[in-house]
């Protein structure tokens, strides 16, 4: 499964009631570190898309999801599992370190 870009209107539907864990990548077009992280997020979506739903949400036009997830800076990640927020991370992170973080919550990584 590829990376799916969502908006505030789709946030609840795409993150809640899912059969697999959901990773939400919060980003901004003006954010340099976000651009650096984008390939890692895309690779994770490609490599684990059958077991992990990966969503991309631009922060500026989507303030409701940003507030709901208490995102204070970008890039930011939120991992939902069984409708619960189980992992948060703010700031740029390299793919190996991101996989390490995800591995703590996901047994298939």
Curated annotation (Swiss-Prot):
It comes from Synechocystis sp. (strain ATCC 27184 / PCC 6803 / Kazusa). Residues 2-107 form the Thioredoxin domain. Keywords: Disulfide bond, Electron transport, Redox-active center, Transport. One of its GO terms (cellular component) is cytosol. Pfam families: Thioredoxin (PF00085). GO terms for molecular function: protein-disulfide reductase activity. Belongs to the thioredoxin family. This is Thioredoxin-like protein slr1139. GO terms for biological process: cell redox homeostasis. Coiled coil: none annotated. CDD domains: TRX_family. Disulfide bonds join 31-34.
């Amino acid at each position: 499964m590829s990376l799916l870009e969502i908006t505030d209107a789709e946030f609840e539907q795409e993150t809640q009631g899912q059969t697999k864990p959901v990773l939400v990548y919060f980003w901004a077009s003006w954010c340099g570190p976000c651009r650096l992280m984008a390939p890692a997020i895309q690779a994770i979506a490609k490599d684990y898309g059958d077991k992990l739903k990966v969503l991309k949400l631009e922060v500026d036009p989507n303030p409701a999801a940003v507030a709901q997830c208490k995102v204070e800076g970008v890039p930011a990640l939120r991992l939902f599992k069984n409708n619960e927020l189980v992992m948060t991370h703010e700031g740029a992170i390299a793919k190996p370190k991101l996989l390490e973080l995800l591995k703590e919550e996901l047994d298939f990584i």
